[in-house]
Amino acid sequence: MTFSFNLSDELKSTLLVLAKKDKPLADAINKKIRQIIDSDAIDHYKNLRHDLNNYKRVHIRKSFVLLFKVNKKDNHILFDRFGHHDDIYT
């Protein structure tokens, strides 16, 4: 099942900066986004808890995390934030 998706403004600006400074990381993020929207097992991705309980997360490389929200009713994913795992949850 393929999901429709949007990128938050924050994530768009992060990707623009990374495309210039760290192209392999930007490519890894784009590859992971394509993998997620084409995934049949969207529940495979870890749900977060507490204040971020409506988000799921996926690791990119070892130290970075991409947060996203899934709306199964509308078959839509909002990719919201990307950052280092020490900073992303604040």
Question: Language-model segments: which ranges?
Answer:
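Basic, amphipathic "hinge/linker" alpha-helix immediately C-terminal to the N-terminal HTH DNA-binding motif
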Residues: 7-11
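Enriched for short, Lys/Arg-rich terminal
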Residues: 2-4, 16-26, 42, 60-90
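Alpha-helix boundary recognition
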Residues: 20, 30, 37-38
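Nucleotide phosphate-binding site architecture
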Residues: 12, 49, 89
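A short, surface-exposed loop/turn module that caps and links secondary-structure elements
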Residues: 34-58
